[in-house]
Amino acid sequence: MKTINYYWRLFATAFCFFVFGVGGILIALLIAPLIILVYRDRQSRHIKGKLFIHYCFRMFIELMRLSGVLSYTIEGAERFKKPGQLFLANHPSLIDVVFMIAFIPRTDCVVKGKLSKNPFTYGAVNAAGYIMNAEPEAVLEKSIDSVKSGNSLIIFPEGTRTTPGGDFKFKRGASNVALRGGFDITPVIIDCCPTTLTKSDKWYHIPPRKLHFSMAVKEKISVDEFLDEKSANIAARSLTKKLEEYFIQEINNLCLN
């Protein structure tokens, strides 16, 4: 038998999705044009846009917490504060990127092109100047330039949300950014318990109890040992394998706790 708490969380989840949608439209209609009007320089405009989205997402996270949809913990949150970092994270849930942007002040990320046309997201995407996932070489160069300019770049190296119980495979794009840019990697281990908002879940498929979302920001992984490889492809493949093994071990440790 489903409890009053379950139906409250279902209502609260619907309300949070409603707020997110309305907020996205308001950003597109009011905030994004205002930022463009006030800040004529593109770089300044995108910095202000990123900060605005950061604060909006932080308030949205608190709305979900206060309404009883979820609780959260962050281990090593102080590591989010330093600018110009490359963050790699696993991707179990739809709200992973919302959490990361909410707690990293000046965040950049690679987004699907369709988000720049979606009425609920295009305002935020354009205001912040997020990187469109288009031609691979252009994405690589823009990603490197973004980190060098002081943004912190988020990459989910799986390329999509993790399928529960499925294979854990990384694409090489994140390794190419790290190696070409000479950036150490800050790994973030994300856990959702119970699982929710996976690729196969609808928004109303809420878990039987309140979701607890956790992020553990780990110590940097140096890429120096891979920079001397004669072949860039071999270096990227080797680093990707190391990262896969690292994340698999960390996630398995979560399952044991």
Model-derived features with residue positions:
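Catalytic core of membrane glycerolipid acyltransferases/transacylases, capturing the structured
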Residues: 33-55, 67, 81-135
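Hydrophobic beta-strand scaffold residues
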Residues: 71-72, 132, 153, 185
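Short gly/ser/thr-rich secondary-structure transition/capping motifs
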Residues: 66-74, 133-137, 197-200
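A transmembrane-helix-recognition feature enriched in membrane-embedded lipid enzymes
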Residues: 2-73, 123
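Non-catalytic C-terminal accessory region of glycerolipid acyltransferases
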Residues: 140-257
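Glycine-rich helix-loop-beta junction characteristic of Rossmann-like nucleotide cofactor-binding loops
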Residues: 76-80
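A generic structural signal for alpha->beta connector loops
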Residues: 69-71, 106, 127, 150, ...
